[in-house]
Amino acid sequence: SVTINKIIVVNNGSTDGTKEWLDGQSELHVIHQENVGGSGGFYRGIQEASQMDCDWIWCMDDDVFPSENCLETLLAFADKDEKIGIACPHRLMSGKTFTGEAKTLNLSNPFKDMHDNALMATDVESNEVTDIVGMAFEGPLIKKDVVEKIGLPNKELFILYDDTDYSYRAILAGYRVVVVRDALMDKY
């Protein structure tokens, strides 16, 4: 598969021995911080990565595991179209397609879920690439140009809709956000 230049781990206030274990991993670039929510962790990790010499930033949460060729597959599709700013993996839970993304958003009613047109398993399974509006921070490959153009995730959102906000901002900036069917990632 593809060689990864650097792995950045943001330890978001773990108290279960994670800090000590991470401190013993010399091949990792580890950042320890207080728990500032998922959005604060992604904010810090993307901030750190965007200051490095890279073209793409691959984000993951602690409950997802990419298949061996996931990154290679994401890159292959992302490099085919310069408009792709974020390429997301096809997530599986217990061997079945897991979706939480949205194909459209409804921002007209603050009392309803903004994910108006949910991505269905059949959408992902029947198309090589599916355009989405709302993504999850569970494996997206983000073009560094996107970060330079739209900035960092909104850390004030703490744990909810930070990823949807980020992907929507990328789309408003003219990028495509897609799910790549053959880029597999397990979610636990």
Predicted feature descriptions by range:
Residues C54-D63:
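Short beta-strand-to-loop acidic/aromatic patch adjacent to the donor-nucleotide binding site
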Residues T18, F42, N69-L71, D162:
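Acidic donor-diphosphate engagement hotspot in glycosyltransferases and nucleotidyltransferases
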Residues N11-E20, V64:
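A conserved acidic beta->alpha catalytic loop
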Residues N69-A102:
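Conserved donor NDP-sugar-binding/catalytic core segment of glycosyltransferases
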Residues T122-I142:
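A recurrent flexible, glycine/aromatic-enriched loop bordering the glycosyltransferase active site
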Residues P140, V146-G151, E156-A183:
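A short, conserved alpha-helix in the catalytic core of glycosyltransferases
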